[in-house]
Amino acid sequence: IDFLYVGSNSLDFEIPGTLGIIQHHSITESKPRHYPLYHFSDIDFIDSDDKSFLVCNHMDNVFDQIRALKNCTLIVYSDQSHGIHNQRRFITELMNQNILNPVIIRRTYKGLSKEEFLMHSSVDVGGLQIDGLGDGVWLDFESDRSYVNQTSFGILQASRTRISKTEYISCPSCGRTLFDLQETTAKIRKRTDHLKGIKIGIMGCIVNGPGE
């Protein structure tokens, strides 16, 4: 995680590593790596010299004002079910106008199971990331945060935006596999899951395996 949003709260402990803290602009503290968050209605209060974050809807016309805010990161959200198209159009317009501010893609999901959340977010966010659109991900979901984080990093990894873990590519197994492929894959994972950025192919076929 690069940034942690705490809303109007404060942290009473030392920030670990290089983690940045995002707070609502009305209470942002003058501490290292603390950054204010604004909404589009508050854009006139943004100091162009300070690093900041701006939440905007795909329908907000930020293009003229954002030119002067070179240190501002845009958090672009859509509350529509097919928001991927709206966010794509918004980011494309930024590129057409040569606006180079970083963009975080934000989506919120409610009333879904974990599996549905995984599928929806992978399509909505991954569909943009795979085309090189967006610099970060912000997912909101009614579930444990560890699962949301795991899903976020999985999308970033699958789109080759950020490599954070070992990747395993295994054949689906068939009658030509003479050993327990799932058990073998589990053993390999146990020994190698610390090798960040490595791709490991696991072949079980006695015909194609040796050649590949």
Q: Whereabouts are the PLM-identified features?
A:
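A short acidic, amphipathic alpha-helical/loop segment
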Residues: 14-17, 64-65, 89-90, 212
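Surface-exposed, flexible loop/turn segments at secondary-structure boundaries
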Residues: 12, 111, 208
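Nucleotide-binding motor/catalytic cores of P-loop/tubulin-like NTPases across gene-expression machines
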Residues: 206-212
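Catalytic alpha/beta core domains of metabolic enzymes, predominantly
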Residues: 36-43, 48-202
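A broadly conserved detector of short glycine/acidic/proline-rich loop/turn motifs that flank catalytic sites
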Residues: 10, 143, 206
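Active-site loops and adjacent core secondary-structure elements that bind or stabilize anionic groups
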Residues: 1-57
